[in-house]
Each structure stands twice: as C-alpha cells, then as structure tokens.
Regions:
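Acidic two-metal-ion nuclease catalytic site recognized across multiple nuclease folds
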Residues: 70-191
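Metal-dependent phosphoesterase core characteristic of DEDDh/y 3'-5' exonuclease domains
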Residues: 1-76, 82-85
C-alpha cells in the first residue's frame, strides 16, 4: 500500500509488462505448463548471474536491481511510463479520466494484455474496497449494454468468457500504458 507522498513499485509487475511487450527482454525458464517463469532465481540463472547466495535479502534485492536495469536498457522509451503508476493517486487519476488504455494481468501463469476503458469516472470503484477499480474489456462492444437494467446487466456480464469486467487494484502499483500497446493484440485488432 502507499501513503502519500511515498512511492513504491513492484518489479514483478514491471518485468511482466516488459516481457509481454517484448518476449526477448529477458531470458526465461518455462513452467511445467509451458509458460514463461519470472521467478527471481530462474531469471537470475538465465541472465547468467551468480545464484549461490540466492534468497538472502541483499542478494535478492541486488539481483532484482540488475534485472530491472536490463529492462530499463531494453525499454528506454517506456521506462518512465512503467513507473508512472507507482502511487494509488496516479492510478486513480487515470481511471477517472474516462480514457482507453492497456493493462496487464497474469492469468493462470500467462501474461496477458487488455484494452480497457473506465466504466464511469464517478462510479468506477468498488463500494466496499475503494482501491479496486472496475474497467470494461473492449474486446466486446459496450453499446448493447447501455440500456440494460442493473439486474439484467449483472446476469449478462456473468456470461462472458473471458470476463468483461477487469479489476485493477490501485494500491498495488499496476502498470497502465497507452492504448496503442493493446491495440496490437489480436482480440482488439479490428477496433
């Protein structure tokens, strides 16, 4: 969590985004399911780093720093954008802007990119969990949903697979990027 004006980010989120945008960013191992693994020890091994003292606080922090330096070097144009959502406020500002943007999630071990839009700037957060923002996945046309009653909408949305609503936790430093990235994905290419 974040307390203003402090900032923090999650290196794993940054690594997932970098690897999703360019699978050549880091050398990775594969999981048993055949997905790229971004486990720190495996990344260290694949980059040729010494892993003899892995799992000590100092060594893991230093390894993370070296991996993030590789990402920064290979993603110079996007590095500042990767870090721009390091506070809850910065993410909430984006969600309230009524824009269209790219978000990234790890779903069943696969890094996924989604083209999403805020539902409504005044009603885009969970009523009980204020840091949960709701976004609409634009692989579906939202137009037919606009005139449904709330109850019909709830029933209709539960039928979608993959799910039509994405949840973004604003206090977990998610990476939110320009829509141009997700528009390259097959699911959104015709928009």
């Amino acid at each position: 969590t974040h307390s203003s004006p402090n900032k923090e980010h999650d290196g794993l989120h940054v690594a997932r985004v970098a690897q999703t945008l360019n699978p050549e960013t880091l050398k990775t191992e594969l999981t048993e399911a055949g997905n790229e693994s971004l486990a720190l020890e495996g990344l260290a091994r694949q980059q040729g780093f010494d892993t003899s003292q892995q799992h000590t606080a100092y060594h893991d922090a230093f390894t993370s720093l070296k991996i993030l330096r590789i990402i920064k070097d290979k993603h110079k144009d996007n590095w500042e954008n990767f870090l721009s959502t390091s506070t809850k406020n910065s993410v909430e500002t984006i969600l309230k802007s009524e824009g269209i943007y790219s978000i990234f999630e790890n779903v069943k071990g696969k890094n996924m990119m989604y083209l999403v839009s805020t539902l409504h700037p005044d009603h885009c957060f969970h009523p009980s969990y204020a840091s949960w923002g709701y976004l609409f996945d634009l692989r579906r046309d939202p137009e037919p949903l606009l005139n449904l009653s709330v109850n019909d909408l709830k029933v209709y949305l539960k039928k979608f697979s993959p799910k039509a609503l994405r949840v973004i936790k604003t206090n977990k430093a998610p990476v939110v990027l320009d829509k141009k990235f997700a528009l390259k994905e097959k699911a959104y290419a015709d928009l």
